[in-house]
């Protein structure tokens, strides 16, 4: 199984120069190959320049030779993926006039593949190869005499097989890196009938039902607060900045470094919080002996729906696919099965109904956002959704199992540190 870790390391002036030059060369190689794809007919080429053609045709050119061979090939490969995505979008009609991949105005990250990385087990240092052309240029121009690039960080210590190392352009002596490494696959645990179901939402990010003890609990209440804080802060700064530009008569309003930093902080804060929430859930499943997690599949739930500009903003920013990915790989490390279950009518059917399907759906019983009333019985609406998701999974998979409804009234709210 492949995992990744992201961190930032300090680099010397010489290393920053080396990395910066390779990132610059990567952007120029991208632009050369991109121009070739956009204008291959005008340049008199007989066939469309795909990845296989470009990685051979540019092998002896300046920008290609300034990069390790596999790194240069990876730049061409990423461009190839971008063009394939463009053509697929054009065929599907998802966007009326999709634009082709753009030219890079700034340096771009570079990717070292496994062949260019040397790492001794249980050490915190990796050695990266440098191309001969780059070493010669650096010696003549900057008097930098480096045969290899050495990076040190404690995250390398626990890694046996590093598959990729993605390096971003240095900023103020720091360099962000993403390490992709491989760990042995964990064998899936035998199913013991102990399951957990998850209902994803906005106010309650994850409402969970434990089939073993009938317990329900809510995770991720701080997600919406984080989103709201950053949206308000970004709007405040944008209003000030755009007002200043308008007062000076600027015709085309531009963004600012402050606004870009706020967007980055928002992305990092939300991603960090989702990792903490999903890690808590994975640890809970491991401790309780749960062998299967069933999550409601809400993909395409936003399609062709207009719920008002405020709800639309919340709904469209919900990173449900990222949550699925985080849950799947964290649970896989413990051998726990992860399943996405279609969840139609799960929030409208009573937990006491014979089945979860359209004929038993009664939307009128959901009195308020968090209240479901069935006769004299009241339940938490999100807990009912999580409970019915598990019932629907049992129905689809042909499993007959009694589930308790005693914990659906008052779910426990679990607070995870932000």
Question: What label would you give each PLM region?
Answer:
Residues 4-6, 112, 123-129, 162, ...:
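Broad gene-expression machinery/nucleic-acid interaction feature
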Residues 49-170, 313, 317:
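Acidic carboxylate diad motif detector
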Residues 33, 74-86, 383-393:
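Stable alpha-helical structural segments in soluble proteins, enriched in small hydrophobic residues
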Residues 34-37, 41, 83, 87-94, ...:
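Long, hydrophobic, amphipathic alpha-helical segments used as structural scaffolds
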Residues 3, 17, 171-418:
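Positively charged, helix-rich recognition surfaces that bind polyanionic ligands
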Residues 8, 78, 127, 176-178, ...:
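Beta-strand secondary-structure signal
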Residues 26, 75-83, 259-266:
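Short amphipathic alpha-helical coiled-coil/interface segments
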Residues 1-74:
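Gly/serine-rich nucleotide phosphate-binding loop at the start of the catalytic core
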């Amino acid at each position: 199984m492949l995992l990744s870790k992201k961190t930032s390391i300090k680099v010397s002036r010489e290393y920053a120069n080396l990395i910066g030059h390779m990132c610059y060369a990567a952007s120029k190689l991208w632009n050369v190959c991109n121009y070739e794809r956009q204008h291959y007919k005008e340049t008199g080429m007989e066939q469309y320049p795909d990845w296989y053609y470009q990685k051979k045709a540019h092998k002896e050119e300046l920008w290609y030779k300034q990069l390790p061979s596999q790194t240069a090939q990876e730049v061409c490969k990423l461009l190839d993926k971008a063009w394939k995505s463009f053509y697929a979008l054009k065929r599907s009609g998802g966007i009326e006039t999709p634009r082709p991949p753009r030219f890079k105005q700034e340096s771009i990250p570079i990717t070292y593949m496994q062949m260019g990385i040397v790492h001794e087990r249980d050490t915190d240092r990796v050695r990266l190869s440098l191309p001969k052309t780059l070493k010669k240029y650096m010696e003549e121009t900057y008097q930098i005499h480096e045969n290899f690039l050495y990076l040190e960080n404690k995250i390398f210590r626990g890694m046996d097989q590093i598959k990729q190392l993605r390096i971003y352009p240095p900023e103020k002596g720091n360099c962000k890196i993403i390490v992709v490494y491989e760990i042995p696959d964990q064998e899936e645990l035998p199913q013991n009938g102990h399951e957990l179901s998850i209902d994803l939402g906005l106010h309650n990010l994850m409402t969970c039902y434990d089939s073993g003890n009938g317990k329900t609990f809510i995770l991720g209440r701080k997600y919406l607060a984080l989103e709201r804080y950053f949206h308000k802060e970004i709007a405040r700064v944008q209003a000030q900045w755009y007002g200043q530009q308008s007062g000076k008569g600027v015709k085309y309003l531009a963004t600012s470094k402050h606004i870009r930093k706020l967007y980055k902080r928002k992305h990092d804060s939300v991603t960090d919080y989702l990792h903490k929430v999903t890690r808590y859930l994975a640890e809970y499943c491991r401790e309780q002996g749960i062998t299967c997690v069933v999550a409601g599949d809400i993909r395409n739930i936003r399609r062709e729906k207009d719920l008002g500009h405020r709800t639309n903003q919340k709904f469209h920013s919900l990173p449900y696919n990222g949550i699925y990915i985080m849950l799947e790989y964290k649970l896989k490390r413990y051998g726990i099965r992860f399943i996405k279950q279609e969840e139609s009518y799960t929030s409208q059917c009573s937990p006491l109904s014979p089945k979860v399907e359209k004929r038993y759906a009664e939307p009128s019983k959901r009195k308020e956002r968090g209240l479901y009333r069935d006769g004299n019985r009241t339940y938490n609406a999100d807990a009912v959704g999580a409970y019915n998701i598990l019932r629907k999974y049992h129905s689809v998979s042909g499993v007959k199992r009694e589930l308790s409804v005693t914990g659906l009234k008052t779910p426990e709210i679990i607070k995870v540190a932000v």
